[in-house]
Amino acid sequence: GTMERDSSSIAIVGSRKASPYGLNAAETLAAELAAQGLTIVSGGARGIDTRAHRGALKRKGRTVVVAANGLDRTYPRENKALFRQVVDSGGAVISEYAFGVEPLSRNFPARNRIIAGMAAATIVVEAALRSGSLITADLALDEGRDVFAMPGSVFSETSRGTNHLLRLGAIPLTCAD
């Protein structure tokens, strides 16, 4: 797709094994931000990433998938139609990896720096304590960018990372404004 140079982008990241609350929050938040003209950037993975991309598309917004593999591979496979819709709607699926590169585990933390670097701010919806989303948050902070985290249940494994970010000073996200 063709993107405007000065379009503002927000990263929305989180757990692949998200709760129903997190999935709904990611999609709703992405839809509201896309309706305000912001481009949603995420990694295209299952869970929060997928729902963020879908939320942006629901409101006819622009979204960018940053893949951790070559563009001739689709990961996860079930998102092939979603990635086509992203491109057809004026967004993009991008990767720093050459054709033929599989989605290896070491590629995901590396692609997170691109997600953080493309966005004016990063929102972590849900994340465990050992989550790649926390790597994205750290990279965003290293670049001097704001990091928002959605508060979650103290009993939820998928909220331990976001609650940890809040204790460290992340901006609490309680609405899309």
Features from the language model and the residues they span:
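Glycine-biased, small-residue-rich flexible motifs in mid-sequence functional cores and linkers
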Residues: G1-D177
